[in-house]
Amino acid sequence: MDLYHTPAGALDKLVAHSLHPAPEFTAAVRRALGSLDNVLRKNGAGGLQRPRVIRIIKGGAHARGTALRGGTDVELVIFLDCLRSFGDQKTCHTEILGAIQALLESWGCNPGPGLTFEFSGPKASGILQFRLASVDQENWIDVSLVPAFDALGQLHSEVKPTPNVYSSLLSSHCQAGEHSACFTELRKNFVNIRPVKLKNLILLVKHWYRQVQTQVVRATLPPSYALELLTIFAWEQGCRKDAFSLAQGLRTVLALIQRNKHLCIFWTENYGFEDPAVGEFLRRQLKRPRPVILDPADPTWDLGNGTAWCWDVLAKEAEYSFNQQCFKEASGALVQPWEGPGLPCAGILDLGHPIQQGAKHALEDNNGHLAVQPMKESLQPSNPARGLPETATKISAMPDPTVTETHKSLKKSVHPKTVSETVVNPSSHVWITQSTASSNTPPGHSSMSTAGSQMGPDLSQIPSKELDSFIQDHLRPSSQFQQQVRQAIDTILCCLREKCVDKVLRVSKGGSFGRGTDLRGKCDVELVIFYKTLGDFKGQNSHQTEILCDMQAQLQRWCQNPAPGLSLQFIEQKSNALHLQLVPTNLSNRVDLSVLPAFDAVGPLKSGAKPLPETYSSLLSSGCQAGEHAACFAELRRNFINTRPAKLRSLMLLVKHWYRQVAARFEGGETAGAALPPAYALELLTVFAWEQGCGEQKFSMAEGLRTVLRLVQQHQSLCIYWTVNYSVQDPAIRAHLLRQLRKARPLILDPADPTWNMDQGNWKLLAQEAAALESQVCLQSRDGNLVPPWDVMPALLHQTPAQNLDKFICEFLQPDRHFLTQVKRAVDTICSFLKENCFRNSTIKVLKVVKGGSSAKGTALQGRSDADLVVFLSCFRQFSEQGSHRAEIIAEIQAQLEACQQKQRFDVKFEISKRKNPRVLSFTLTSKTLLGQSVDFDVLPAFDALGQLKSGSRPDPRVYTDLIQSYSNAGEFSTCFTELQRDFISSRPTKLKSLIRLVKHWYQQCNKTVKGKGSLPPQHGLELLTVYAWERGSQNPQFNMAEGFRTVLELIGQYRQLCVYWTINYGAEDETIGDFLKMQLQKPRPVILDPADPTGNLGHNARWDLLAKEAAAYTSALCCMDKDGNPIKPWPVKAAV
């Protein structure tokens, strides 16, 4: 079913036979959705008010008639009478969704014959998601169930919604596409009234898109619906016939994708420029970075979203496809794309025409001229329109020509030579522009700068190896300018000390200038002046006004030119500070200066000393707003940052430069009202990333940047705070922190002021920009691959309250279930292939292939986990033979693995290690859709000592007597007992396996802390210790997670007494085994015997003291403390059996 190898003439057959959904699955889904529809209508949405279901509309690819075989989607939009406005939809969904989920749980027990039901994690709030799949999992459909406000009501066919529907939508201040569900009916009608063959072309495009998805793991691709709209546009502009060549249509769509940076497409079938509010909004939308593809049903939803999606990945693949078999005629000639307004021309890289929807709907300047950007620099006009950039072109407004005339005109002039030849097409519903951006402007973005600031070169275009020099050359302020600023600040302070009425105690310099994170072009300085008259937090506000008036008067009188080449300008004032600007005569830089009178809460502190606890208890009891008294702690804030290594502060400059470019791109646009998070939040995020993921003086700048960008994308999970200045041991601080930790994420607390949480601002927009930057060269290594981020989680275990540990495990440690299912399916395929094909022409036989490691036990952690594939071979007849002929055996298994890789189809990315080691064979299975999710496998040939063992039965004692007589090193033949090791853990309750995950995560954090000091005990030893703690202390399948964790830490602290073993598989009944066990148990503590292999002592010869030290530190952390600050009590478990 490979598209590229299908001849152009066979594409219709490919669509008919391979892309249309399986009829029996479609019928089963239709029956299931009909049944669910009845249940929902009958029961309503539950709850106290029992809202009435007005109607239910089906959307998504399934309803639009563009569903692909394999996997597709459907949207069930439930219009309820209790939702009377767009605002209601935001606030009322929690109770409604809870009631609907209860209905779904009942209905999902039996969704219909041939179907399975499983809930999925919601991609957005206000939505319930589940999956219906065929029993063989070959076909599935993701169902999104959305309660919605019936904005449209009962629409008549071909009747536009009233304009007030859209003006009401825009006045609701919604996010882009937030209420798209309300317009599902329009979206569905827009697509499924199209000719059958056009929908076949859509299937072909989506099949190509799916093939790209399987090859790209990390990139965030545009939604497939964007490609449906692009396909419709291509057909409208270039064909409009019911019968056409699929190859030609596909070639046209891919050419548009290749030229995506010039796309600006919209339709006016449902909304237009007639209404002033809608018209003004559309004008702003059409100025967004390319590509712009507006949903024909909801103008707030830009499917192109040039700043969020990796269109460049699709464009690269589109370009690669043009010479493939699917675009070759039988004669060998290449298929040419359609020609038409706004479409690429054969052999010409630029798009054919800049086009607008119609003269009366076009964007007009003050003189009534249409503003369209030129296709080439040579087309720039000599007299640009007033108020427009120099690159804008003036085109005289002209009456609407008829459709027929427009098409004739366009056919004659595909690539216009003069602007006057450009025509206006009333039927095309599109405006396409060509930008002439500078080399420093990234694809899809306009180059914007704030007056008085220097943006510098575009970060996305800087190779990763040049980032250090880029920071030095373009981001660091000049030492001469910094000296000027210091001189000006000293002059200002001297003036205030001498001239002001009130006595100044001391001064603190803060802001980015004080912290050493100021960027070239524009920086901020915070001068906090501590006055004797401001004696406490509560009294600070009462005297501030008169002090500020005095300050302003003195500065205006005495300090107009505080330093040579710098002038002082007063700007808009706020109630608690004086705001000024230091402006150099050449206007090359700008310094925003805030002067704040404040209460000296901290006093002069010695280096490294903490403020007194009463400082913070006084702050919390003052009843202040969040961050209201942040200025009082400016010195602590400055010291927290400027004591960091120079390279870490360079990384902060890089992050802030990216942040500044994002802010400039959206300045004055539709998102301008939704301010970005404060830049200081990104400084703290950068410190957190470095502390948790690196901690070294020298590091890769690209890796650090990518880590910060990844954390920005995880903003909904961020929980970050430090206790360098305040402590959880203080009851008032602890109670305050626990309240803060109950808030929605992100949570980033100022390390100097615990009341200041930097959750404000449009984190979603910043996350979209972070995702867009991840595909650029600044984050690519020399071989073109993305540099790896540091291993940093968005929240820390020791900062998680004890009562939240189950949630912490579920959110951050539990692997994705769908990925685990994919891995299991892939491993089953590999095992079967190896068993059937290895040593086919040899006397050696593969007896069985067994999966081991954390993945098999059910204790794998989210992210990168490990597993073993143990291949039991007939050529090994005893333990001592296991090492013989290893190189030849590994070579044969590798050859078959490579054959399996080529011949079999996998839902995951299957990579065999290229490491040249004749004794080791490894491969990795990686998710194609989830970032950072993979399992590393080691393939291990082994002697089948156990044979076919029945479940629950003990091995023959002779197995262990042979083992004892054969082994030389502890655990030498442990691979032979993989099945027993796996079953010992996998049979345990689910919650116990969650506790094992928690202990393993803690262990991995400890490994980072003690790196270089010695080898910690093996991780498997801690798994066994956790099982022992539960067996001896609880045995309840539903135990308290904090108590279980605390017990394991307690046992680690008692490592000198540890003696743990089991007799589930071996015992003292046999004399040889009994004597051996006595010898093992008499060895120095700790002793933890492998329950499957008595030769394996997992407590021997490791730095338990380092682990015990870390365990002791954790017992006083929030995760081991109840809400009153008392330590969680461990279970009563003895350290020895």
From Swiss-Prot:
Reactions catalysed, as given in the entry: 3 ATP = 5'-triphosphoadenylyl-(2'->5')-adenylyl-(2'->5')-adenosine + 2 diphosphate
Binding site for ATP: 854, 997, 1000, 1019
Region listing for Linker, in residue ranges: 342-461
Region of interest called Disordered, as start-end residue ranges on this chain: 434-462
Residue positions where N-acetylmethionine is found in the record: 1
Listed GO CC annotations: cytoplasm; cytosol; membrane; nucleoplasm
Main location: cytoplasm
Pfam families linked: NTP_transf_2, OAS1_C
Regulation: Produced as a latent enzyme which is activated by dsRNA generated during the course of viral infection. Strongly activated by long dsRNAs at least 50 nucleotides in length. ssRNA does not activate the enzyme.
Membrane-spanning segments: none
GO MF annotations in UniProt: 2'-5'-oligoadenylate synthetase activity; ATP binding; double-stranded RNA binding; metal ion binding
Location of the region described as OAS domain 1 in the Swiss-Prot/TrEMBL record: 6-341
Entry function: Interferon-induced, dsRNA-activated antiviral enzyme which plays a critical role in cellular innate antiviral response. In addition, it may also play a role in other cellular processes such as apoptosis, cell growth, differentiation and gene regulation. Synthesizes preferentially dimers of 2'-5'-oligoadenylates (2-5A) from ATP which then bind to the inactive monomeric form of ribonuclease L (RNase L) leading to its dimerization and subsequent activation.
Recorded family membership: Belongs to the 2-5A synthase family.
Subunit structure: Monomer.
Protein name per the record: 2'-5'-oligoadenylate synthase 3
Originating organism: Rattus norvegicus (Rat)
The encoding gene: Oas3
